[in-house]
């Protein structure tokens, strides 16, 4: 129902009421005088009828009789009819008394009773007619919108323009009680979110669309849990970030994703500061084909870098991100480089050729169990690869170097975490003798990355289960990829040199709960349709992650979601000696003992078992 249809329906109701209000008084007179109306009485009514009808229509209008949703009429609507008719007849009676117009009281009472019956019957017929029209649209999808705000109104316009032939919009639900029983874009606001199951059942809803782009994860989770009870298909409008970046348009809809359930307040960035250190600069991104590296390249492209060098050793991933960026940002200059960060000569040629002013170092090995098996490769890539790129940045006078680290570097129990902590120490040492500002950013898991648990869970659910979780109490910090990269860029703008920045990761999330959420998002029931089994912790895995060691403290920064850790660098000579040992050996026990020497909080099961 659109605005034109709404006006038509109001006009129909007013016309019906005019006919009823004109006929009922004559019928009351016929009953009063047993079928023969005296000429004098008839003349009085004929002259009075126009203003009586006008008074009744005015009272009906202000009483809301033409704003009600008769398609969903209930007992309270019948009470409203009684109230409106009673008020109008009382007003007419007062006028006739004051104007000394002779109207028998019995006629007034009969008119009151007959008007209630006739107007009530007209509304019932109106409801039946609308129900028949709705049923005739059986090939259409009955759609309910959650969120009676600007986004909901925009969605209605989009659907009426592009999906009118297949979609029958029924109305809205919204938790704002002030909106209850009102209308938006011509459609009724039918109740609140907790009433979703009843509303869906009563109105045969096929699909529910969540139209609250600013809603946080807890709100989305609550709405989804209510929707899950209905059996209706559920979709969602994009979040604020997706619309701002152009990833999705306002009127588009998609399935609910896990990241929707983890939404936090939008991050407010100081774009002026980010622009100051990136705009017009040559930027090198290592690991540019990975989850974090590719998102850094997207966001930097919006800032307006002079040139962006996309470096990685996997040709397919570099090719894919390059094609995407060229399509989205045709004015931006890109260079693709296939190289291994541990290849000193190759990387030196890259730095000499492009002379990058800003470096984002996202290249790393990150799979914990794999690095437990081959610690020498983790050392070569995560430690010496980082050292190689950092020293070249210093030698070629880069302005800022940002290392992407991990919460697994804190009190590490894995080789991967220990090598990332070592890379942080290497960066701090280089920073002490360089004009380049070297900083580290530490954060937890990112949703949607190729190494996260989510893709694994998705495959297991698609295969019919079971979903494998290592431990029922395992928790992790999670951020979305765009959220993490926004904070990486902001942290870079605050760099003075030597800092380790931490992000506000929100509350840790139980992996078990995440698995259950994903199962429900597929319309299935955890434990019934898809089993969850617990496999035990893998080598190097923690039950929970930390962002700080017990010795470290933090201070706030100018951004409320970014903190600076107080970390003491390792003795320079000790660091160099340890790095030399790591560089000269491939022996597993020597590597683990050296890492333990450099990082006293490192706890290695392999070392403990060897002892």
Regions found by a protein language model. Give the residues of each.
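Signature of alpha-helical transmembrane segments in polytopic membrane proteins
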Residues: 1-138, 143, 167, 229, ...
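A solvent-exposed beta-alpha-beta segment
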Residues: 33-37, 126-245, 319-320, 327, ...
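Flexible, Lys/Arg-rich cytosolic regulatory linkers and terminal tails that connect or flank
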Residues: 222-282
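Conserved Rossmann-fold NAD(P)-dependent oxidoreductase catalytic core, especially the SDR/UDP-sugar
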Residues: 245-246, 361, 365-424, 431
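Strand-loop microenvironment adjacent to phosphate/nucleotide-handling motifs in alpha/beta enzyme folds
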Residues: 268, 273-277, 429-445, 450-611
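N-terminal Rossmann NAD(P)H-binding glycine-rich loop of SDR-like oxidoreductase domains
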Residues: 283-301
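Conserved Rossmann-fold cofactor-binding substructure of NAD(P)-dependent oxidoreductases
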Residues: 338-358
């Amino acid at each position: 129902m659109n605005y034109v249809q709404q006006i038509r329906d109001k006009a129909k109701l007013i016309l019906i009421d005019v006919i009823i209000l004109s006929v009922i008084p004559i019928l009351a007179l016929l009953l009063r005088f047993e079928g023969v109306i005296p000429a004098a009485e008839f003349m009085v009514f004929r002259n009075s009828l126009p203003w009586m009808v006008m008074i009744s229509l005015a009272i009906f209008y202000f009483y809301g009789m033409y704003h009600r949703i008769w398609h969903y009429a209930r007992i309270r609507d019948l009470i409203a009819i009684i109230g409106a008719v009673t008020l109008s007849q009382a007003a007419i009676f007062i006028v006739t008394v004051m104007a000394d117009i002779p109207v028998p009281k019995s006629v007034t009472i009969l008119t009151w009773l007959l008007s209630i019956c006739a107007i009530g019957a007209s509304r019932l017929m109106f409801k039946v007619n609308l129900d028949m029209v709705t049923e005739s649209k059986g090939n259409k999808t009955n759609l309910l919108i959650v969120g009676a705000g600007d986004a909901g109104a925009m969605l209605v316009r989009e659907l009426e323009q592009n999906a009118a032939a297949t979609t029958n919009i029924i109305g809205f639900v919204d938790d704002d009680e002030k909106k209850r029983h009102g209308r938006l874009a011509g459609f009724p606001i039918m109740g609140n979110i907790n009433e979703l199951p009843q509303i869906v059942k009563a109105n045969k809803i096929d699909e529910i669309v969540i139209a609250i782009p600013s809603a946080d994860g807890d709100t989305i989770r609550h709405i989804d849990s209510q929707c899950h009870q209905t059996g209706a298909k559920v979709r969602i409008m994009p979040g604020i970030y997706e619309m701002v970046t152009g990833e999705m348009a306002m009127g588009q809809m998609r399935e609910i994703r896990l990241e929707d359930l983890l939404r936090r307040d939008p991050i407010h960035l100081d774009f002026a500061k980010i622009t100051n250190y990136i705009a017009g600069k040559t930027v090198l991104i290592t690991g540019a084909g990975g989850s974090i590296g590719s998102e850094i390249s997207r966001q930097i492209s919006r800032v307006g870098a002079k040139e962006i060098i996309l470096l990685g050793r996997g040709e397919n991933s570099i090719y894919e991100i390059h094609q995407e960026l060229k399509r989205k940002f045709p004015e931006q200059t890109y260079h693709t480089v296939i190289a291994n960060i541990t290849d000193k000569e190759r990387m030196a040629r890259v730095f000499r050729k492009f002379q990058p002013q800003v470096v984002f170092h996202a290249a790393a090995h990150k799979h914990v169990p794999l690095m437990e098996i081959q610690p020498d490769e983790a050392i070569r890539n995560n430690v010496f690869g980082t050292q190689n790129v950092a020293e070249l940045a210093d030698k070629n006078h880069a302005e800022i170097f940002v290392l992407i680290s991990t919460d697994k570097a804190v009190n590490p129990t894995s080789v991967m975490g220990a090598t990332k902590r070592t890379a942080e120490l290497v960066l701090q040492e280089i920073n002490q003798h360089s004009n380049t500002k070297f900083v580290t950013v530490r954060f937890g898991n990112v949703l949607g990355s190729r190494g996260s648990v989510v893709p694994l869970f998705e495959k297991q659910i698609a295969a019919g289960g079971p979903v494998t979780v290592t431990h029922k109490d395992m928790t992790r910090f999670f951020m979305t990829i765009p959220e993490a990269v926004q904070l990486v860029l902001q942290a870079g703008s605050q760099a003075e040199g030597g800092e380790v920045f931490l992000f506000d990761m929100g509350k840790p999330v139980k992996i078990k709960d995440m698995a259950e959420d994903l199962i429900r998002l597929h319309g299935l029931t955890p434990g019934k349709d898809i089993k969850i089994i617990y496999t035990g912790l893998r080598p190097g895995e923690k039950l929970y992650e930390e962002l700080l060691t017990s010795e470290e403290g933090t201070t706030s920064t100018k951004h409320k979601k970014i903190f600076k850790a107080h970390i003491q660098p390792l003795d320079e000579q000790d660091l160099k000696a340890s790095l030399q040992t790591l560089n000269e050996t491939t022996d597993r026990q020597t590597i683990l003992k050296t890492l333990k020497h450099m990082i006293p909080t490192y706890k290695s099961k392999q070392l403990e078992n060897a002892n």
